[in-house]
Amino acid sequence: MEQHTSNPTKEKAKEEDSVACFCPAKSSPSYIDLPANFTPANFLTIQTKLSSGAGQKPKGCLGVLECMYANLQLQTQLAQRQIAILENLQASLSQPGSGRESKNCSLPGLCCKLLLNHLPQFHK
């Protein structure tokens, strides 16, 4: 009686062969207008020469990685700008004589010093 035993290594190799690269994503509703001379390669240099043999990825995958890296760079810049805005706001609220007396606070029941204590401290 002949038993058929499956080889897990061969099955895994078949799965890897059937995996395809992702297609480029469609534009997002939160569209960011990039400069006309933008190229993802400016942000990331990838060594495209892979070792010979199995396991080589199509060049399209590298393009996706470059776009993801560029997206992370843009998100980092935006986050840094937001932190700078919050730091400026915090500094302006903590200046003495800014005309903001606790009795003139616009939020009922809270004074501006209480608000300052609840603002997170940001460090560069």
From Swiss-Prot:
Cysteine pairings via disulfide bonds: none
Annotated tissue distribution: In testis, expressed in the inner luminal layer of the seminiferous tubules.
Source species: Mus musculus (Mouse)
Function as written in the Swiss-Prot or TrEMBL entry: Co-chaperone that facilitates HSP-mediated activation of TSSK6.
Family: Belongs to the TSACC family.
One cellular-component annotation, GO: cytoplasm
Lineage of the species this protein comes from: Eukaryota, Metazoa, Chordata, Craniata, Vertebrata
GO molecular function, one term: protein kinase inhibitor activity
Subunit-structure text: Interacts with HSP70. Associates with HSP90. Interacts with TSSK6; this interaction is direct and recruits TSACC to HSP90.
UniProt KW Chaperone keyword: yes
Stretches that traverse the bilayer: none
Listed name of the protein: TSSK6-activating co-chaperone protein
Domain of life: Eukaryota
Entries under InterPro entries matching the protein: SSTK-IP
UniProt keyword terms in alphabetical order: Chaperone
